[in-house]
Structure formats: C-alpha cells, structure tokens
C-alpha cells in the first residue's frame, strides 16, 4: 500500500529498501535521488541539512506512532513531502520516484497550483530556489513513513517551480 499527501507549501522523502534507514549511505541515496530528478528540469542540486533531517525525524516518529498521515500543522517555514508504504518494500529511489511521477500533471498546466494534490510533491522536489533537504524514515509494525523537509519551501502560488519567477 502506498499513500501520498500534499498541502501548500509542503512536499518530502526517505528509503528503507537498500541502505539502512537514516544511515549516511541512505542519506546519500535519497539526496542523489532528489538531485537526479532536479537535474532533469535544470534545478540546482540540493545540499543535505542535519537540522531538516532532525525535524523530519521528529515528525515521522509522530506519524508512525499515531498512524496518522497528514502534514505537520505546526510547520510553516519548511517545505514538506510525505510518503507511506509497506514496511521494507520500497527503496529511497522508489519513494522519491513516486513524487516524480507527478511531473506529467505539473507539465500539463502552467497553473500547477490549481491541481496541487496532483503536482505538489513533484513541484517541491524540483523547486528551483529550494537549497537544502533533510529526510527521515521511521517504521511502525506495518509501514515505513518518510518525511522530507525542504528549505526554503517551494510551492509558492503564482511562481514557477523551475525559475522562481511569476508565471
């Protein structure tokens, strides 16, 4: 089972399949997956943030403990992407890839925010003015919960995810 959630200005990422969750190799894998998708649309690479990863870990733990799957209502300054799926069934690349699948919808409409639930993960993933990311993966009995935090946040209504300029 795979679940995704998005709200402006939020979007996020983490992996369980290959590298041990939250290890240095896992961090490198999820960062590489982000940056590969960003390169495809000409966005500059992201840099890993331990602070964002710590914030993501705290919220991922809260979601895993509660079984809830909603964006953090107390987070107003960071972009956020959420992912939830069957425990140990998906790699970091597959998790990020699920957000990247929204590219077709985002490319179809210049007013991407009109369909944020269909495009918001992808647009945060590639948002050109976002510079840092931190992700964390937490598991409960049945699911992996991935939270990725971004700064500065993307999904700014009226701006292009590719240039930071108004459309």
For each feature predicted by the language model, list its residue ranges:
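Short, well-ordered surface patches within globular domains
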Residues: 22-79
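Flexible, active-site-adjacent loop/turn segments at secondary-structure boundaries
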Residues: 44-46, 50, 67-69, 80-82, ...
């Amino acid at each position: 089972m795979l679940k995704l959630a998005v709200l402006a200005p939020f979007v996020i990422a983490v992996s369980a399949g290959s590298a041990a969750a939250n290890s240095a190799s896992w961090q490198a894998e999820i960062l590489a997956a982000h940056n590969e998708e960003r390169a495809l649309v000409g966005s500059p690479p992201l840099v890993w943030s331990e602070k964002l990863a710590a914030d993501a870990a705290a919220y991922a733990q809260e979601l895993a403990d509660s079984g809830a799957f909603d964006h953090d209502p107390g987070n107003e300054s960071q972009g956020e992407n959420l992912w939830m799926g069957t425990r140990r069934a998906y790699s970091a690349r597959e998790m990020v890839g699920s957000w990247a699948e929204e590219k077709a919808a985002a490319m179809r409409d210049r007013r991407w925010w009109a369909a944020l639930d269909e495009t918001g993960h992808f647009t945060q993933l590639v948002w050109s003015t976002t510079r840092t990311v931190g992700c964390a993966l937490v598991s409960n009995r049945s699911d992996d919960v991935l939270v990725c935090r971004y700064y500065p946040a993307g999904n700014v209504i009226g701006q292009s995810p590719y240039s930071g300029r108004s459309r």
